[in-house]
A protein has these predicted regions:
Chain A
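Conserved active-site "lid/cap" helical segment
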Residues: 1-87, 95, 152-159, 182-188, ...
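Condensing-enzyme catalytic core mediating Claisen C-C bond formation in acyl metabolism
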Residues: 1-26, 165, 197-262, 266, ...
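Conserved active-site and cofactor/substrate-binding residues in soluble primary-metabolism enzymes
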Residues: 23-31, 45, 63, 87-91, ...
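Short acidic, glycine/serine/threonine-rich loops at helix termini
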Residues: 20-22, 63, 94, 119-125, ...
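Short glycine/threonine-rich loop-to-helix capping motif typified by GTGT followed
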Residues: 58-67, 247-252, 286-310, 321, ...
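Conserved catalytic cysteine-centered active-site region
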Residues: 2-4, 54-111, 115-133, 137-144, ...
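Beta-strand segments within the central parallel beta-sheet cores of soluble alpha/beta enzyme folds
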Residues: 44-53, 78-84, 108-113, 161-168, ...
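Active-site-proximal alpha-helical scaffold in enzymes
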Residues: 83-114, 142-179, 217-223, 333-356
Length: 390, 361
C-alpha cells in the first residue's frame, strides 16, 4: 500500500520565557494554536483531529487534555493525548503523520505545551526512574546528563571547551529567533566554563533552561498542502525508536545512542539519505545539554564517531557552515518540555518552507528533526520541499 | 491510496484482581503480552512496535510506559504511549498499520490501581483554580451526574443495581451479586452507592494487530479492525451531563465509514465505570429508554447484546477498560463471527468517546 503524502503547512509558537504570569497553561497552548492557524487563515472548522502532548505530572493536572478540550479546539473532534517524555512533541508530529498517511484525516492539528513555572519539573522527572532501583540514585535531568556526558568525554575525548562552544552557538543563534527564550548575544566560551558546575561536567550554561511555552503545527494530506503553503514541508520519514528502560541497560549511553542510530537508519533509508552532512541542509536536534548535540551528531552519522568535538571546532554546524545545527537556538535556548520536540519539527518545517525569518538558512531543501526523551528514546523526522513519490 | 486493513490476531489478559501484589507493573503487562503472543503464535522479537495506554497519575510515574515498553517490543523499535482509554490506543495502532509503516504491533493497556490513592489521583483531574478547593473526586462528579440523569430519565438506583447485577453475573472476575446486595452497599455520593462503581483493579490487556499480508501468510484466526471514530465532549461543568451526543456522533461516523446499519451489530461494548453512565450511554446510542433499556442490559440473547462479558462493571481497570472490551468482543467474533461496536470513554463523567468496529468472519 502507499501512504497518503503528508506535509506541514503551518506552525505557531509562543514567545518562550521562564515564567508566563499573564497566561494560564491553556491560554499558552491556545496562543500557539491561534498563531499557527492565523498564519494560513485557517480556523478550527478546517481541522479534523487534534493531537496533544504535555507531561501532566509536571503541572499536576491529570487528564489535562480533557480539561483543556475547548482551548485545544477539540470539542466534537478526535483528540489523541500522547505522553512520552521529552520526545512527546515529536511523538505528536509522528502521530499526526500516521493519522494522515493512513487516510483517516485530511487536516490534523498537533500541539505541545508546558508551563513549567506552575509545577516542579525535576520532581516529576525523578519519578521516571524505576521506584526500587533508580529513583534514589538518578534524580532529575541534570544528574542523568552529567553521567552521560562523563561517559561521552571518556569515549570520545571531547573537551569541556568544545561543549561550551555548542552552548555559545545555541545562545547566539537564539538571538535571531523571535520565539527563543535564552538569548545571550555576548556569551563567551570562557563564561560558560566559569559558570558553576551543576553536576560534573555540566556547567549551568551547558544545560537547557526551563520554559513556559507551546508550539502547534498543522499537517495536511496530499493536494490540500499546495494551496496552503508556497513550499509545504513534506514528511519523508517519521520514525520512533526506544532503548531499554534501565539506564544501566544502555551501554555507554549518549556516547552510543542506539535508539538514535536505529531511528536514523530507518529514516535515512526511507528518505534516501546517503550522507547526512551533504544531504541535509539544516538540522534541529534535541540537545538538552551541550554535550548531547555533539554526541547526537556522531550517532546521526553527521561526522565520524568520536569526531563531535572537531565538528564544532571546524564550524561545520554554525549558521554559515555546511550543515547548520539548531539555528533556532535549540533546546539549550528554549525548553517547554511538552512542546520542545515539536519545536524541533516546527523549526525544521519553517526552514523547509523558507519562512524562518532572521534565522533562515539559505536554500533549504531537506531538514532533519529529532526528539529525545525518557531513557535515550528517539523520534526522528525528515522534511523536504519535494513531495514524496509514491 | 489503498489502505491496508488491520487485523486482531492475538488476545491476552493478565489475571485481574483488586491487588496484584505478586507482580510489578512490568510483570503484569508481560502476563497479558505473553498470553497474546502465545495466542497469535509470535515471538516478542518479531513485533515491530507497540502503542500503549496508561496514565502517569495512576502509575505514579512520569512516562508511565517506561515500565512496559521493553516487554512490549519497544527496544530499538517504535512505541508510543496514549494517555487515554485503550480504544484510543487501538485507533492509533490501526492508523500505523493502515499506512503501511508498521506491519505487526502490540496494543497494550495497563493499570495498577491498587498502588494509587484514588482520591488524590482523581482530585488532580479537576480544575485547579475553581474546583479542587471543594475536594471532589470522580465519584462526587458522577453522583451529581447520576442525580441529574435519574431526574431526567425517570430511572432509579434500583435500575442501576440491575445493570450491575447483570454485569456481575457475566463476569469472569467478580462474584455475582443480587440487586438487593448492590442497593445495600454504602452510599458514596448520593444517589450513588459503592457498588454502582466498577471496583478498582489491577489489570492489563494486550492485542496483537497486523496487516493483511501477515494475517494471510500465517493464515491466522482473525478479527478485522474495520474502522473507528472519536469525539471529545465539553468539560463536565460545561455540558448537560445527562446526554452523550458525542458518543452518538462517533458511532454514527464509524458506522457510516463502515457502511453498516446499527441493526447489523451483534454486540455492543460500553466503556464507563458507573452503572448510570452505562444506561445513559446506551440511551445515547438509541438502544431504548426506561425499563426496556434496563432489560437490554439483562438480556443474554438477541442482537446486539450489551457488555456480554460484563464490561467494565464486570471487572477491569480504568484506561484498560476499552481495550479489555475489544479483546472480549474479538474473542467472540473470532469464534462465532458477527459485528461489534466497542466504546471507550476518557474523562470525568465519561467526557470523551472513542469507538471501534470489529468484524469476525
Amino acid at each position: 500500500m502507499t501512504p497518503v503524502a503528508a506535509a506541514i503547512v503551518a506552525t505557531g509558537q509562543t514567545d518562550h520565557v521562564s515564567r508566563r504570569l499573564d497566561a494560564s497553561m491553556a491560554e499558552i497552548a491556545r496562543e500557539a494554536i491561534d498563531r499557527c492557524l492565523a498564519s494560513r487563515n485557517l480556523s478550527f472548522d478546517d481541522i479534523d483531529a487534534i493531537v496533544a502532548g504535555n507531561m501532566e505530572m509536571f503541572e499536576g493536572i491529570y487528564l489535562v487534555d480533557q480539561f483543556f478540550v475547548d482551548a485545544l479546539g477539540a470539542l466534537g473532534k478526535p483528540l489523541f493525548k500522547l505522553n512520552t517524555g521529552g520526545t512527546v512533541g515529536a511523538s505528536v508530529a509522528v502521530c499526526c503523520y500516521h493519522l494522515i498517511a493512513s487516510g483517516r484525516y485530511q487536516k490534523v492539528l498537533g500541539v505541545g505545551f508546558e508551563k513549567q513555572s506552575d509545577g516542579s519539573t525535576q520532581a516529576a522527572i525523578t519519578t521516571v526512574g524505576d521506584p526500587i532501583w533508580e529513583r534514589a540514585v538518578m534524580a532529575g535531568a541534570i544528574g542523568n546528563f552529567a553521567t552521560m556526558a562523563s561517559t561521552y568525554i571518556h569515549e570520545s575525548g571531547v573537551t569541556e571547551e568544545q561543549a561550551a562552544k555548542v552552548a555559545v552557538k545555541a545562545r547566539h543563534n537564539a538571538c535571531r529567533n523571535p520565539h527563543a527564550h535564552l538569548k545571550l548575544p555576548n556569551l563567551t566560551v570562557e563564561e560558560v566554563l566559569a559558570s558553576e558546575y551543576l553536576a560534573f561536567p555540566i556547567h549551568r550554561l551547558d544545560m537547557c533552561p526551563s520554559s513556559d511555552g507551546a508550539c502547534a503545527i498543522v499537517m495536511v494530506a496530499g493536494d490540500s498542502a499546495d494551496g496552503l503553503a508556497e513550499h509545504p514541508a513534506w514528511v519523508h520519514a517519521a520514525v520512533t525508536a526506544h532503548d531499554q528502560q534501565y539506564m544501566g541497560d544502555s551501554p555507554k549511553r549518549l556516547a552510543v545512542m542506539r535508539s538514535l542510530r536505529a531511528a536514523a537508519e530507518k529514516g535515512y533509508r526511507q528518505a534516501g539519505i546517503a550522507d547526512p552532512l551533504r544531504d541535509f541542509d539544516v538540522a534541529e536536534i534535541y540537545e538538552p545539554a551541550s554535550y548531547a548535540e555533539l554526541a547526537m551528531c556522531e550517532n546521526l552519522g553527521i561526522c565520524e564517531m568520536g569526531a563531535g568535538g572537531r565538528l564544532i571546532d571546524e564550524g561545520l554546524t554554525q549558521m554559515d557552515g555546511p550543515l547548520p545545527v539548531n539555528p533556532s537556538g535549540g533546546v539549550q535556548s528554549t525548553n517547554p518540555v511538552g512542546a520542545t520536540a515539536l519545536i524541533r519539527v516546527a523549526e525544521a518545517a519553517l526552514q523547509v518552507m523558507g519562512e524562518a525569518g532572521e534565522h533562515q538558512v539559505p536554500e533549504v531543501r531537506r531538514a532533519l528533526a529529532t526528539g529525545y526523551g525518557g531513557n535515550a528514546w528517539t523520534d526522528l523526522m525528515i522534511l523536504s520541499r519535494e513531495r514524496p513519490t509514491p | 491510496m489503498t489502505s491496508s486493513p488491520a487485523w486482531i490476531v492475538g488476545i491476552g489478559h493478565a489475571a485481574c484482581a483488586p491487588a496484584r501484589d505478586d507482580v510489578n507493573t512490568t510483570e503484569l503487562a508481560w502476563e497479558a503480552i505473553s498470553a497474546a503472543l502465545d495466542d497469535a503464535g509470535f515471538q516478542l522479537g518479531e513485533i515491530e512496535g507497540a502503542v500503549t495506554a496508561s496514565q502517569d497519575f495512576w502509575e505514579g510515574r512520569t512516562i508511565s510506559s517506561m515500565s512496559v515498553n521493553e516487554v512490549a517490543g519497544g527496544t530499538l523499535r517504535s512505541e508510543a504511549k496514549v494517555a487515554a482509554d485503550g480504544v484510543m490506543a487501538l485507533l492509533y495502532a490501526m492508523a500505523r498499520i493502515e499506512d503501511g509503516d508498521q506491519h505487526l504491533n502490540l496494543v497494550v493497556a495497563h493499570a495498577k490501581e491498587s498502588q494509587a490513592d484514588p482520591h488524590t489521583v482523581e482530585l488532580a483531574a479537576f480544575d485547579p483554580y475553581y474546583e479542587r478547593a471543594l475536594n471532589p473526586d470522580e465519584t462526587v462528579a458522577a453522583g451529581l451526574q447520576a442525580d441529574l440523569y435519574y431526574r431526567r430519565s425517570g430511572l432509579t438506583p434500583e435500575h442501576s443495581a440491575r445493570v450491575v447485577a447483570a454485569a456481575r453475573r457475566r463476569s469472569g472476575v467478580l462474584d455475582p451479586l443480587s440487586p438487593d446486595e448492590i442497593l445495600a452497599s454504602p452510599i458514596t455520593a448520593r444517589p450513588l452507592r459503592a457498588l454502582d462503581r466498577a471496583p478498582l483493579m489491577d489489570a492489563a490487556t494486550c492485542l496483537v494487530v497486523c496487516d493483511e499480508q501477515i494475517a494471510r501468510e500465517r493464515d491466522l484466526p482473525r478479527v478485522r479492525l474495520v474502522t473507528g471514530a472519536a469525539r471529545s465532549g465539553p468539560w463536565w461543568t460545561a455540558r448537560d451531563l445527562t446526554v452523550a451526543p458525542e458518543l452518538r456522533a462517533a458511532a454514527d461516523e464509524a458506522l457510516e465509514r463502515a457502511g453498516w446499519t446499527p441493526d447489523s451489530l451483534t454486540r455492543i461494548e460500553l466503556g464507563a465505570p458507573y452503572a448510570h453512565q452505562q444506561l445513559l450511554l446506551a440511551e445515547a446510542l438509541g438502544l431504548g429508554e426506561g425499563e426496556a433499556l434496563v432489560e437490554r442490559f439483562e438480556a443474554d440473547a438477541g442482537d446486539p447484546r450489551i457488555n456480554a462479558d460484563g464490561g467494565w462493571l464486570g471487572g477491569t481497570a480504568g484506561t484498560v477498560a476499552g481495550l479489555a472490551s475489544a479483546a472480549h468482543a474479538a474473542h467472540e467474533l473470532r469464534e462465532r463471527g458477527g459485528r461489534a461496536l466497542v466504546h471507550g470513554a476518557t474523562g470525568l463523567c465519561a467526557q470523551s468517546h472513542a469507538v471501534v468496529l470489529l468484524e469476525g468472519r
